[in-house]
Amino acid sequence: MATAGKVIKCKAAVAWEAGKPLSIEEVEVAPPQAMEVRVKILYTALCHTDVYFWEAKGQTPVFPRILGHEAGGIVESVGEGVTELVPGDHVLPVFTGECKDCAHCKSEESNLCDLLRINVDRGVMIGDGQSRFTINGKPIFHFVGTSTFSEYTVIHVGCLAKINPEAPLDKVCVLSCGLSTGLGATLNVAKPKKGSTVAIFGLGAVGLAAMEGARMAGASRIIGVDLNPAKYEQAKKFGCTDFVNPKDHTKPVQEVLVEMTNGGVDRAVECTGHIDAMIATFECVHDGWGVAVLVGVPHKEAVFKTHPMNFLNEKTLKGTFFGNYKPRTDLPEVVEMYMRKELDLEKFITHSVPFSQINTAFDLMLKGEGLRCITRTDQ
């Protein structure tokens, strides 16, 4: 492309300080360096993680910053050493990477890349410790190596999944974080059998993606657990057959579920990050074969307490990160699941706004309205 090797000026939504509305600014985006790729972002979605680090409550504030990590785009140019991507390729940026060289990447059992595992505090490129974004010469920090709230961004090649160019980017962009996290937690980690009973704790976008995985796996009974009764109607679209609100019961919700299911559910997936829900997720599974999977990120001082007999009675507890998907290796196949109409993404996309109104997406999420709001960056 004619822009290769040159600085590109484009629009970006900049977070200047914690909790303040993003500002649409003209930024300069430098060319990609070794093992980097400059991507033209076409569609980007808002994830709760963006909101969490925008609010910057309880973490190191890194500002000014360009947030965003769920997106779909097209390769504009590549840096030295990049051989697997060329200009024009369609890609999904991912907040965590796959270098393909470390012990984790070489293991079939892990997706926790040593080099490119998520780093929320870095704010610069891993190669030279510099930002590729500037405004009037002043550096603007990156976010989790992606910074997709910009018309152009620079990303390490290991954090880009090359996908089918026929796949609509305004739909599959939501697969680059939350939906894959929930879907994979069920399909790759819990692995429910056809006809089994599955409980999903937390019915936000990630929990509903986990529920979609249970539906795809052929679970015959899918129990949604949430403190908001309004979530049940929406969850029915994802295969939910029963709904339990812990506030409606005097006994612990795990006891309610055990009674409902004649001894416990076959699989349970937790998508809340609340420690009580995590414990309940484990304690509600059936002895002998029950598997519980933890997805949510708890408070750093939270402590998981359960009786050791739960383990001795052959209940299994697992954790997962990004649904155990290796970004570059596995995400292209998740896109194909959508293309084959096995996976329905449209029902996750509840809102769409122009890039100039990106703050509306933040307002919707803060109010708990909708699941995913898509923004088209050229609007």
UniProtKB/Swiss-Prot annotation:
Give cofactor(s), names only.
Answer: Zn(2+)
What are the annotated disulfide bridges? none
The alphabetical list of record keywords is:
Cytoplasm, Metal-binding, NAD, Oxidoreductase, Zinc
Chain residues that bind an alcohol: T49, H69
- PANTHER family, from UniProt? ALCOHOL DEHYDROGENASE (PTHR43880), ALCOHOL DEHYDROGENASE ADH3D (PTHR43880:SF37)
In its UniProt record, which GO terms are filed under biological process? formaldehyde catabolic process
* Note describing how the cofactor binds: Binds 2 Zn(2+) ions per subunit.
Catalysed reaction equations from the record:
a primary alcohol + NAD(+) = an aldehyde + NADH + H(+); a secondary alcohol + NAD(+) = a ketone + NADH + H(+)
Can you tell me which family this protein belongs to?
Answer: Belongs to the zinc-containing alcohol dehydrogenase family.
- Which domain of life does the UniProt lineage start with? Eukaryota
One example of the protein's molecular function in GO is: zinc ion binding
Subcellular location field: Cytoplasm
Q: What is this protein called?
A: Alcohol dehydrogenase 3
Major enzyme class? oxidoreductase
Query: Assembly and interactions?
Result: Homodimer.
Q: Which GO terms describe its cellular component?
A: cytosol
Identify the residues that bind NAD(+).
49, 202-207, 226, 231, 272, 295-297, 322, 372
List positions binding Zn(2+) 1. C47, T49, H69, C177
Write down the species. Answer: Hordeum vulgare
Q: Which residues bind Zn(2+) 2?
A: C99, C102, C105, C113
Which PROSITE patterns does the UniProt record give?
Answer: ADH_ZINC (PS00059)
EC number of the protein: 1.1.1.1
